UniProtKB/Swiss-Prot annotation:
Residues annotated as transmembrane: 505-525, 536-556, 570-590, 621-641, 674-694, 731-751, 1497-1517, 1548-1568, 1577-1597, 1641-1661, 1668-1688, 1743-1763, 1772-1792, 1813-1833, 1836-1856, 1879-1899
SMART domains, per database record: FKS1_dom1
Role summary: Involved in callose synthesis at the forming cell plate during cytokinesis. During plant growth and development, callose is found as a transitory component of the cell plate in dividing cells, is a major component of pollen mother cell walls and pollen tubes, and is found as a structural component of plasmodesmatal canals.
Molecular function GO labels: 1,3-beta-D-glucan synthase activity
Primary enzyme class: transferase
Keyword Cell membrane recorded: yes
InterPro entries: FKS1-like_dom1 (IPR026899), Glyco_trans_48_dom (IPR003440), Vta1/CALS_N (IPR039431), Vta1/CALS_N_sf (IPR023175)
Organism field: Arabidopsis thaliana
Stretches the record annotates as Disordered: 1-29
Protein name: Callose synthase 7
Length: 1958
């Protein structure tokens, strides 16, 4: 063996080169290690975690080598050698990725160890390893049986198994001794019983864990292991060649899931996972409200309930398809066993389904057939004979994956390749929904079972290209499969199609109001006059045409799915269209006969129809037309009837409903109960009445008279070439005036919604008791009832106790005891989080020794200054009666408690210290005198109050000495001296007859010596000073005596105050009663993680930016109190932290203030802490303890038993899984950041043993001689110093390739979650201990019977945004987000009933959702906003969502301008995609009218309204442009009749830009007012306006409108990573330009030109005040869009930064693009990417883009006629000449450009002459124009205004027709034209910034503006702006200093600018 290793060669046959290998070795070991300890030595243990994926099986061997290295280095060497040999056998050619490097590294390591390792037990390797194996077995396994935990035994058996494998390679079989063989057989026999487990060590022998001793677990295991009467699986004849292992596999099974696995071929990991899953579910459901005595088996009702939950969707599917359910229970069968078989089968299918989990009805189909097989196997042949009908054995454990899941996965994968990474149209490929909805039709049974892979579902014409040079993801083109039921067409018509009833209502209401307003009276009552009413009836004609439009859209947009539709559905579409067309013809015809004296078109119709039609036929037609609407209204008022009919599968009902609503599997019966219906109907009726009244009186009525005047006016003096000079009635003017008003009419419902939701939300919040305790003063005033409220709401009622109806003032000591345990833990967690200091902690704690005094001991912060005030009160008391003094003291509630407690505590402390009995007697007599004098009302006569202050001072000194260091020499003498002083003051200064007590003591002691007095009180017991509870008592008394008014502001931290007040307030809100821990619902938390920060490294903390600012330094300034508290904690001598521990604590302190995974995990793990505390409270319920958190220390066994029991119950109820998608890749990565993330995640697993990490493992495996990637879902836990694998489940392929990343990441890990509820928590969230305590209350919201028959399926929780203190932007976002997650969602849930799932931290009904497609949707692009689709899906499938505000979680938000814009763009993109989705269409069509309105205005309607707001500005200004350039406005305004009426000017000013800003702020003000007080809300509102919040929100309005509109027009949606940095930073001008050029700057400059033209050409006849009145809001919008990115950009106006930005922008503009040039390096690359959406848009998108670009031609057309050179000619020739001039200029520029390229090098002189000639020619032309033709300077500027937009139009058309221009050879010209325009725009925007940067005060003002909120929080930005921190002090030394040592060098010559580092 030794010779083999020393003379070994590499796999290439050459001897190893030692030096390079050493280098590589050191490099590899430094790349990362699994060990938490990081030794500095070069020689480090082999990192078993860096094994290449293709050699994964050798990793356990290397782990064992590392484990035993210290014990026996030689055996460890042999293990490594075995690993090397095995690796070489697995991959002899080293073809796998990383294999060659790893083998070389390992070989070098072996060569080194061969020389240095020595034998320890024998002289040869064979003997050495045998002896070690035997010793290891005897010392660890044999002795450990029954003593060690199952986890420890699992590791030992794993090591023993590997050692024996190594032993067999080292020792020949014949030389293995009997003892070793015997031990090896024992290991082999028992190792399966000691595998690593998740929660339940099901088959572990020996020491029992507490969780396995729970009776509910035992009963559940008994039920699952009931395999009686299950036939043994028999293998098919093809399996005759199975090896012995497989044969053994078929002979035995321990439970029903193993039996199912043997029958169907489920994977071992899947079986183990679902076995535990099922046992935990059964145990948790069964134990609820059950007596634990005689608990031996599961109740039948438990299994029945679980069956109902799991198979509700399956049974519904069977009924829908009218097929028999295969959940069959033959007579005489074991119903419970069969039920569990069905549940187990479903779970195993679901657990292995991978991406198919998103297709719930596909799973129903699979289960349907497999359940039929189970029934056939069990009951098909009662007497088994040869040749069974069903073959009962699967060939291997991957049979199900290979034969069922993988084929469906391959269909998904082929379809998603058609998507072309989001560039293909949705209609070109089938997504998850399309493939799932295939199973909504009975045609799905054509797939048969086993599935026929030649069926239509599997045959795909687009196979992967086999061309060698073609990329793997490309597909060849062929005939595609049709969409199923719905086609996601990219058009704005989707908004009308989905919400047609709303648009019809608005259009018909508008028509009605215009008709009524047109009446001369203008009164709304005019509708009752006959002629007006007759005209109003024309709305039905409009309705008919709108219905026709709807039917046409349905017909056209669904055409791509016709091949998948039933004939009845197609017929419905066609019939609907024909009926709509018929009404659109019939109603106008019948109306024409009803009109008296018809004219025009009506006369034509009337004469055509003839006289046989009676005049009232129109009335009959209307009655017939509205009949369906009347029936719909009746059904609306009877929701139960509609619900029954929609859910019915009876053919007659289906036929009746066929016309009203097409039959669909989902979206049936979504109607609410009557009271809910009344609430949201009332809300919308009130809103619509207000909206219509406002629209009528403010928008429509004022325009009617001016419209009539303009209608009758005749204009002849046009100022341009008018194409229709003889047109009557000025239609263009009327359109220009009415256009913006109509748009505002359609949009302002959104504003009314904001107003009404604010009012309703505020009222509902007030009735929900929100904000009743919002300050420390309020908390102190109500704290006396907080304990009873806590016990009433958050603790379960003891058995036999009635629920309290009212909270009374009396304080129950049991309440105080239970409350104190939770409260003190809450305070301690805040101390651990450094939110409070040690002193604040002591002031806030409720003492644990409550039984020592006769009164309730309140926290010292309530009793602050009560004792000093009482002393002053007593000293200055002038009365004679005791009663008056005590009445005065008792008038202050807490003062009485403080006085009594102080007295009794002083007594106990002094009495406890004394040893001498006579001394104790003196104290007893003093106390007796005090007590008896109080009882007899002679206290004032027996005691002098003037001596009390002196006594208080001595007591304070006494207590401080008691708490001082015990080691001091004079400690005892000091105590004795002060104690003697105290007794002397009491007896001589305070007591009138105190000397008598001392004299009696002398007499009783038998000693009358006069000097004996001096020897009293010398014998004291100092051992008490070491007693923790006694010291707590001393500390508390000292606080009572010394703390003054300063405690009123305790705690200092605003966050601590917020948490305390919110928790106390929530106790008075409505919430379900708390169940016992055993009775509560079990739940899991799931967090998806990709590559975000886990824990900041020391390097990241101390990395400086260019201004010398580090993260650490910044956080010290922004959180000064918390930093001070941290320093106090880590420097506490009692903790005795090492420097290494302090460095780790520092990393955690910083990370817990960022948006990191470690913060999230810490917050979620508070659930376990809360559960364990709740277990303790229930444990001590019968004998309520006044003690602390843990039972008495006297009985260690009881404490351990309790602790184990609490942990067992916590395991039973709570699971936390973090889905770290790329953890496996990070593990093997050589990049430092990936390795850091991996190590930090591992550290989290080790810190929190119950934390589980799931990841997607990517391995290279050899299949059929070829290496291919194989994917697994893996679950890990921390164990010892490494992670340990629990479950491994093979996947059909890469799961994240099919859908969006985050939902796929959640989906792969959801199988590892447990329980009945699932909380989704994002990576930027936090949680709080006190909120975790309410979790069992929240989960009761799912409980049956709380809301009748219908239970919620998603519980919405409120969030606290913790990033609001960084900057003003962060504050704006925090307020906006807070208002949405509170008042916004409050109204959505109640009364509107349209709350969905908006992200996290909502809680899902887990079983409901895993049987209906999961907790999100994942189809690429269309489900970009994956979270909200979970809410849509839940609602469509019969669930509903609630919202609860008595509990909250923390959440971080983006804090910089660009990050916020990225976020807004992402959400706008998502809403654009939602508009196209089938979910929105179905909800819009299937909700009743008022819920549909709620749904629209709270989802896609909000974004469409934002777009309409922007569009209104454009329509208004282009209308003005038309009026002013044509001369119509001048003619109309100068008309006498119009001039006298100011109504027109009022109409022109009716804009709504500010209204959406108001819409944003109003809910914020209401919510802040509710929770902080309306004075605070008003102050915040004013501050926000001063900080330009309106500018910010107006800017974001443009972001929403741009991205929403572009998504619907062209697509291009994508996930945008926003970044979660600490602070904002200075963004360069070029970066801002790239981000906002198209979304804001281009639009802003267009509006500037519009406003300038409108002003310039209307000045002569319009006053400037009128102009500003009309356009002020638009100028505000323009300013916001152009300059907001720079206003909110730190150091945006600092001169040096401005200079650098200009240089950077010029460089970027000048750089040429090309392949590989990124967009931030070259303008050309960016410009190309910016047009990406146009490359992939459809023909409709291109046509729309060109039509929109044509608007820019209007400027040139209008302005050229106003030039002086045109001399008022209005012929078309003028416009033609302007085009000739423009084209000439472009041609000359093109010639110069071509000349430069062709002649610039070889014919330089000639080129210069050419340019000179052109210049001279230009001068000549200009001279002629000025002198001869009358050209003026103003004409030049006007020409610029005219021709710039035209050039931009040419550019836009060129981009839309890119391929055409490229074919013509003009593309380079288009590009250069684009570059010229970018230069112009950049210069225009940059100039004001440069000018403002000249003035230093602008930069200072901007800093104040940005960081004012941080100033008020104590952020010393002025210091950061002024200089840098002390470079002499390295960050590692910060740990030893207090906050004050972190000063800044004040240097007047240092930086006067600042930007924060991120």
């Amino acid at each position: 063996m030794a010779s083999t290793s020393s003379g070994g060669r590499g796999e290439d046959g050459r001897p190893p080169q030692m030096q390079p290998v050493r280098s590589m070795s050191r490099k590899m070991t430094r790349a990362g290690t699994m060990m938490i300890e990081h030794p500095n030595e070069d020689e480090r243990p082999i990192d078993s975690e860096l094994v290449p994926s293709s050699l994964a099986s050798i990793a356990p061997i290397l782990r064992v080598a590392n484990d035993i290295d210290q014990d026996n280095a030689r055996v460890a060497y042999l293990c490594r050698f075995h690993a090397f040999e095995k690796a070489h056998r697995m991959d002899p050619t080293s073809s796998g990725r990383g294999v060659r490097q790893f083998k070389t590294y390992l070989l070098h390591k072996l060569e080194e160890e061969e020389e240095i390792t020595e034998h320890m037990l024998a002289k040869s390797d064979p003997r050495e390893i045998q002896l070690y194996y035997q010793t290891f077995y005897e010392n660890n396994i044999q002795d450990g049986e029954g003593k060690k935990t199952p986890e420890e035994m699992a590791k030992l058996y794993q090591i023993a198994t590997v050692l024996y494998d190594v032993l067999k390679t080292v020792v020949p079989q014949a030389r293995i001794d009997d003892k070793t063989l015997r031990y090896a057989k024992e290991v082999e026999r028992k190792k399966e019983q000691y595998e690593h487990y998740n929660i339940l060590p099901l088959y572990a022998l020996g020491a029992k864990t507490a969780v396995m001793e729970l009776p509910e677990i035992k009963a559940a295991i008994l039920a699952v292991c009931n395999v009686d009467n299950l036939p043994r699986p028999r293998f098919h004849s093809a399996s005759a060649n199975l090896d012995e292992v497989d044969r053994e596999r078929g002979r035995s099974f321990n439970d029903i899931l193993e039996w199912l696995a043997l029958v169907f071929g489920f994977q071992r990991g899947n079986v183990a996972n679902q076995r535990e899953h099922l046992i935990l579910l059964l145990a948790n459901i069964d134990v609820r409200k059950r007596d634990l005595e005689n608990y031996v088996e599961i109740k039948p009702s438990t299994v029945r309930k679980l069956m109902e939950k799991y198979f509700k969707n399956y049974n519904s599917w069977c009924k829908y398809l009218r097929c028999d359910s295969y959940l069959r229970f033959p007579a005489g069968c074991d119903k419970q066993q069969l039920s569990l078989l069905y549940i187990g089968l479903y779970l195993l299918i679901w657990g292995e389904a991978s991406n198919v989990r998103f297709m719930p009805e596909c799973l129903c189909y699979i289960f349907h057939n497999m359940a039929n097989e189970v029934h056939g196997i069990l009951f098909g042949n009662v007497y088994p004979v040869t040749g069974d009908t069903y073959e009962a054995g699967a060939p291997d454990e991957e049979a199900f994956l290979r034969n069922v899941i993988t084929p469906i996965y391959q269909v998904l994968r082929k379809e998603v390749r058609r998507n072309k990474n989001g560039k293909a149209s949705h209609s070109k490929w089938r997504n998850y929904d399309d493939l799932n909805e295939y199973f909504w039709d009975k045609r799905c049974f054509r797939l048969k079972w086993p599935m026929n892979f030649k069926a239509d579902f599997f045959i795909h014409t687009d196979e992967i290209s086999q061309v060698p040079n073609q990329r793997h993801d490309q597909v060849s083109h062929g005939k595609r499969k049709p969409k199923t039921n719905f086609v996601e067409a990219r058009t704005f018509w989707n908004l009308y199609r989905s919400f047609d009833r709303m648009w019809m209502f608005l259009v018909l209401s508008l028509q009605t109001m215009i008709i009524v307003a047109w009446h001369p009276s203008g009164s709304i009552l005019a509708i009752f006059t006959e002629d007006v009413f007759r005209n109003v009836l024309t709305i039905f004609i409009t309705s008919a045409f709108l219905n026709l439009l709807q039917a046409t859209l349905d017909l056209v947009l669904s055409f791509g799915a016709w091949k998948s539709l039933k004939f009845s559905q197609i017929m419905r579409y066609i019939t609907k269209f024909l009926m709509a067309a018929m009404w659109a013809i019939m109603l106008p015809i019948t109306y024409s006969k009803s009109v008296q004296n018809p004219t025009g078109l009506i006369k034509f119709f009337s004469s055509w129809v003839g006289s046989w039609l009676h005049r009232s036929l129109y009335d009959y037609a209307i009655a017939l037309y509205v009949l369906p609407n009347i029936l719909a209204a009746v059904f609306f008022l009877l929701p139960p009837l509609r619900r029954i009919m929609e859910r019915s599968n009876m053919r007659i009902v289906t036929l009746i409903m066929w016309w009203a609503q097409p039959k669909l599997y989902i979206g049936r019966g979504m109607h609410e109960e009557m009271f809910a219906l009344f609430k949201y109907t009332f809300f919308w009726v009130m809103l619509l009445l207000s909206k219509l009244a406002f629209s009528y009186y403010v928008e429509i009525l004022p325009l009617v008279n001016p419209t009539k005047l303009i209608w009758d006016m005749h204009v002849v003096n046009y100022e341009w070439h008018e194409f229709f000079p003889n047109a009557t009635h000025n239609i263009g003017v009327i359109i220009a005036i009415w256009g913006p008003i109509v748009l505002v009419y359609f949009m302002d419902t959104q504003i009314w919604y904001a107003i009404f939701s604010t009012l309703f939300g505020g009222i509902y919040g007030a009735f929900s008791h929100l904000g009743e305790i919002r300050t420390l003063g309020m908390l102190r005033s109500r704290f006396k009832v907080v304990p009873s409220a806590f016990c009433s709401k958050l603790t379960p009622l003891p058995l036999g106790h009635a629920k309290r109806k009212h909270l009374d003032e009396t304080v129950d000591e049991k309440d105080i005891a239970r409350f104190s345990q939770m409260w003190n833990k809450f305070i301690h967690t805040m101390r651990d989080e450094d939110l409070i200091s040690d002193r604040e902690r002591d002031l806030l704690l409720v003492p644990s020794s409550s039984g020592d005094v006769t009164v309730v001991q309140w926290p010292p912060f309530l009793l602050a200054s009560k004792i000093p005030i009482a002393l002053d009160m007593a000293k200055d008391f002038k009365g004679k009666e005791d009663v008056d003094l005590f009445k005065k003291i008792k008038s202050e509630y807490y003062m009485h408690y403080a006085v009594v407690e102080a007295y009794e505590t002083v007594r106990d402390i002094i009495y406890g210290l004394l040893q001498d009995e006579s001394d104790k007697r003196i104290v007893r007599e003093i106390c007796y005198e005090v007590d008896i004098s109080i009882q007899q009302h002679r206290f004032l006569s027996e005691f002098r109050m003037t001596g009390m202050p002196l006594l208080s001072d001595k007591l304070e000194k006494f207590l401080k000495i008691l708490l001082s260091d015990y080691e001091e020499d004079d400690y005892k003498s000091q105590i004795i001296n002060v104690l003697q002083d105290i007794i002397e003051i009491i007896t001589q200064d305070v007591m009138v007859n105190g000397h008598e007590i001392l004299e009696r003591a002398h007499l009783q002691s038998g000693d009358i010596e006069s000097d004996k007095k001096e020897q009293r009180f010398e014998k004291i017991d100092l051992s008490l000073t070491q007693n923790i509870s006694w010291r707590e008592k001393v500390v508390r008394l000292l606080l009572l005596l010394t703390v003054k008014e300063s405690a009123i502001n305790i705690p200092q931290s605003l966050e601590a105050r917020r948490r305390m007040t919110f928790f106390a307030n929530s106790l008075f809100m409505n919430m379900p009663d708390a169940p016992r821990v055993r009775d509560m619902l079990s739940f899991s938390v799931l967090t998806p993680y990709y590559k975000e920060d886990v824990l900041y490294s020391e390097e990241e903390l101390n990395k400086e930016n260019e201004d010398g600012i580090t993260i650490l330094f910044y956080l010290q300034r922004i959180y000064p109190e918390e930093w001070s508290n941290y320093c106090e904690r880590v420097n506490d001598l009692k903790r005795n932290l090492s420097e290494k521990d302090k460095a780790e604590q520092l990393r955690q302190w910083v990370s817990y203030r960022g948006q990191t995974l470690s913060r999230t995990v810490r917050g979620m793990m508070y659930y376990r802490v809360a559960l364990e505390l709740q277990c303790f409270q229930e444990y001590t319920e019968e004998n309520a303890t006044n003690g602390g958190y843990l039972p008495s220390e006297s009985n260690e066994d009881d404490r351990k038993a309790f602790s184990d029991r609490a942990r067992a119950l916590a395991d039973l109820k709570f699971t936390y899984v973090v889905s770290c998608q790329v953890y496996g890749n990070q593990k093997k990565s050589s990049e430092s950041r990936d390795r850091s993330c991996y190590n930090n995640i591992l550290q989290l697993m080790l810190k929190y043993p119950s934390l589980r990490v799931a990841y997607i493992d990517e391995r290279e495996e050899t299949v059929n001689g070829k290496s291919q990637k194989v994917f697994y879902s893996v679950l890990l836990k921390g164990c010892d110093k490494l992670d340990e694998e629990i479950y491994r489940i093979k996947l059909p392929g890469p799961p994240t390739e099919i859908g969006e990343g985050k939902p796929e990441n959640q989906n792969h890990a959801i199988i590892f979650t447990r329980g009945e509820a699932l909380q989704t928590i994002d990576m930027n969230q936090d949680n709080y201990f006190e909120e975790c305590f309410k979790m069992r209350n929240v989960l009761q919201e799912f409980d049956e019977g709380r809301r009748g028959k219908r239970n919620p399926t998603i519980l919405g929780l409120r969030e606290h945004i913790f990033t609001g203190s960084v900057s003003s932007l962060a504050w704006f976002m925090s307020n906006q987000e807070t208002s949405f997650v509170t008042i916004g969602q409050r109204v959505l849930a109640n009364p509107l009933r349209v709350r969905f799932h908006y992200g996290h931290p909502d809680i899902f009904d887990r079983i409901f959702h895993i049987t209906r497609g999961g907790i999100s949707k994942a189809s690429k692009i269309i489900n970009l906003s994956e979270d909200i689709f979970a809410g849509y899906n839940s609602t469509l499938r019969g669930g509903y969502v609630t919202h609860h505000e008595y509990i909250q979680a923390g959440k971080g938000r983006d804090v910089g301008m660009n990050q916020i814009s990225f976020f807004e763009a992402k959400v706008a993109n998502g809403n654009g995609e939602q508009t196209l989705s089938r979910d929105v269409y179905r909800l819009g069509r299937r909700f009743d009218f008022y819920r549909m309105l709620s749904f629209y205005f709270t989802t896609v309607g909000f974004y469409f309204s934002s777009m309409i707001t922007v569009l209104t500005v454009y329509v208004f200004l282009y209308g003005r442009l038309y009026l002013v350039l044509s001369g119509l406005e001048k003619n109309i305004l100068q008309s006498a009749s119009v001039h006298e009426s100011n109504a027109l000017e009022q109409a022109l000013a009716a804009q709504s830009v500010f209204q959406l800003g108001f819409l944003m702020v109003l809910p914020m003000v209401m919510e802040i007012g509710l929770e902080k007080g309306f004075r605070t809300a008003l102050g915040d509102f004013i501050i926000m306006q001063l900080q330009l919040a309106s500018v910010f929100f107006t800017f974001q309005l443009g972001t929403k409108a741009h991205y929403f509109g572009r998504t619907i027009l062209h697509g291009g949606s994508k996930y945008r990573a926003t970044g979660r940095g600490f602070v904002v930073f200075h963004a360069k001008f070029a970066e801002n330009y790239r981000l906002y050029s198209r979304s804001h700057f281009v639009k802003g400059l267009e509006l500037v030109i519009l406003l300038v033209v409108y002003q310039v050409y209307g000045t002569s006849y319009r006053s400037s005040s009128t102009y500003m009145y009309i356009t002020f809001s638009m100028w505000f919008l323009v300013t916001s869009w152009l300059f907001a990115p720079f206003i909110f950009n730190p150091s945006g106006f600092e001169w040096q930064k401005t200079v650098d930005d200009w240089t950077d922008w010029k460089r970027w503009m000048g750089n040429r693009g090309g392949i590989g040039i990124v967009l931030d390096k070259s303008w050309e690359s960016w410009w190309d990417i910016e047009q990406e959406h146009l490359k992939h848009t459809n023909l409709r998108g291109r046509v729309l883009e060109i039509l929109l670009a044509l608007r820019f031609l209007l400027y040139q057309y209008g302005i050229v006629y106003h030039l002086n050179i045109a001399r008022r000619h209005t012929t078309f020739l003028v416009y033609g000449l302007s085009w000739a001039i423009l084209l000439s200029v472009l041609l000359v520029l093109k010639m110069v450009s071509m000349g430069r390229r062709k002649f610039g090098t070889d014919f330089q002189v000639m080129f210069r002459i050419l340019k000179a000639l052109l210049f001279l020619g230009f001068l000549s032309v200009m001279t002629v124009l000025f002198v001869v033709c009358g050209l003026t300077i103003s004409d030049l500027f006007a020409s610029i205004l005219a021709f710039l937009p035209t050039g931009w139009a040419i550019l836009l058309i060129g981009q839309a027709l890119r391929s055409v221009f490229k074919g013509l050879g003009f593309w380079d010209s288009v590009k250069e034209l684009g570059r010229a325009y970018e230069y112009i725009m950049g210069l225009v925007i940059f100039t004001p910034i440069a000018v403002l940067s000249w003035f230093p005060f602008v930069s200072e003002f901007q800093t104040r503006l940005l960081f004012n909120q941080a100033f008020s929080r104590g952020l010393q930005i002025s210091m950061i702006l002024a200089g840098k921190k002390d470079k002499e002090t390295p960050s590692t030394k910060y740990l030893g200093h207090t906050e004050e040592s972190f000063g800044l060098e004040h240097d007047t010559n240092t930086f006067n600018h600042y930007y924060l580092w991120t």
